[in-house]
Amino acid sequence: MRNFDAGAPVIIGVGEASRKTVAGEWPAPRDFAAAAIKAALDDTGQPQAVAVAIDTIAAIRTFEDSGVSLGTGSPDNTPEAFGAAGGVTAKRLIYADVGGQSPQAMVNELAGDIKRGTCEMALVVGAEATGTAKRARKAGVTLDWRLASDTEFDNRLSSFPILSRTEIRHGIISMPLAYSLIENARRMALQLDGDAYAQQMAALWSAFSIKAETSNHAQFPGFRSPEALQSYDNGNY
């Protein structure tokens, strides 16, 4: 291939993990992280060589460490714990900041590091087990997902408040409320009325549901037509 940039960052493996748990099973986030990491390593075709070459692990901050605690506790060093569970160690450990932007932000940042030559190979991993925590709470089971560590890591937790006084004053105190404002701002920018915008969004999400129809990891498996997504029937919410 001509004009190939040998320093260009390339994603060489991806992995996903989920499971339907049964009574008596209480998998922690690091259990799911382990399965996802192993799947990603296998996806590279050279799992052992890649695992050894990884010098950076970036873990996406869990809900437990984002101010939405379910009382399970968490490892002192989540990137280290997730990596170790998947058989990977690294000299550089990053625990990403709060927010849904973190997965893509970490991919972007580490791609830049690879391009600049400050990172050879990186692993980005995130895992949650909120279903386990909720089942345990209902069953009266106490879970302890803490794991001691004194290893240093880059803790990206910001000190800025997630909500401003203006947002609180106007009742914008949850993400769904903020999202609805953003969607309406987008609708106005596109000069669409409510019905036209709903049709456009229903068509978009119907296309996503084609993937959900065949995915083993889909929370709501099955195809949903645009008409079904615009209705208020059959559990649509």
Regions found by a protein language model. Give the residues of each.
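Conserved phosphate-binding catalytic cores of ATP/NTP-utilizing and phosphoryl-transfer enzymes
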Residues: 104-112
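A basic- and aromatic-enriched beta-loop-alpha substructure that forms the phosphate/nucleotide-
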Residues: 99
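Conserved "HGTGT" condensation-loop signature of ketosynthase/thiolase-family condensing enzymes
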Residues: 1-96, 112-119, 123-237
